[in-house]
């Protein structure tokens, strides 16, 4: 669909426009960490400094913070369209970030976040949690949600501190309001996700993984995940 694109596709279009290799930043990052892999650089602080230096170099020279902004400036026909799109996208992304943080959903890479260029709506691909062998959500993200430099630049500081924060706070207030019944909704969500989770592929799930958890086990796991969220 020409009206939809992922953030990853926006980056690839920018690379094609300026004749850059899309995978070059990954290669450069790996090369920068060769000293850590070979043991020339040891210690957590030294490795962290090496990673930070590599990230700063790539962010400054290869993946700048205005890629998404330039794409939307070239795509939308007028300033009115741009203003409406920017505000709608800010609200939509704030809600997506809130749900991601609430349900402990990680892996929000640019290829898994899609937006509609004609409406500003945000769609998440592969929007489901990952579970360990005990059925508890695995969340190893270093940040609670995805707000990259490119999105921050496009939203502007005023948009982030205004529409983005307000939309996220309004969603949190609605979830915690009396009568929201959020626990029941989350129980249903985790129950459905646990029932379709590929238990056979879990290395530490034990011999019962071939059969999968029983309905009683699923209820216990879902309850544990809801308690973790709440």
Give residue spans per PLM region.
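Structured secondary-structure scaffolds
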Residues: 98-99
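Catalytic-loop of the protein kinase fold
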Residues: 103-110
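ATP-dependent kinase catalytic cores of phosphoinositide-metabolizing enzymes
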Residues: 1-95, 110, 115-230
């Amino acid at each position: 669909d020409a009206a939809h694109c992922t953030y990853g596709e926006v980056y690839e279009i920018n690379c094609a426009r300026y004749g850059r290799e899309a995978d070059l930043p990954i290669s450069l990052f790996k090369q920068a960490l060769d000293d850590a892999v070979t043991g020339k650089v040891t210690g957590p602080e030294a490795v962290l400094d090496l990673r930070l230096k590599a990230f700063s170099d790539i962010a400054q020279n290869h993946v700048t913070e205005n890629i998404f902004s330039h794409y939307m400036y070239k795509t939308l026909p007028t300033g009115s369209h741009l203003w409406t799109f920017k505000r709608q996208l800010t609200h939509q992304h704030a809600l997506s970030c809130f749900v991601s943080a609430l349900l402990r959903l990680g892996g929000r890479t640019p290829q898994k976040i899609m937006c509609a260029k004609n409406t500003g709506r945000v769609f998440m691909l592969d929007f489901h949690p990952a579970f360990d062998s005990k059925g508890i959500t695995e969340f190893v993200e270093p940040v609670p949600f995805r707000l990259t430099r490119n999105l921050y630049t496009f939203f502007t500081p005023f948009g982030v501190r205004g529409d983005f924060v307000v939309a996220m706070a309004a969603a949190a207030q609605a979830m915690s309001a009396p009568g929201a019944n959020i626990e029941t909704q989350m129980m249903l969500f985790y129950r459905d996700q646990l029932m379709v989770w590929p238990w056979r592929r879990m290395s530490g799930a034990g011999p019962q993984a071939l059969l999968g958890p029983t309905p009683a086990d699923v209820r216990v796991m879902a309850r544990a995940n809801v308690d973790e969220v709440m």
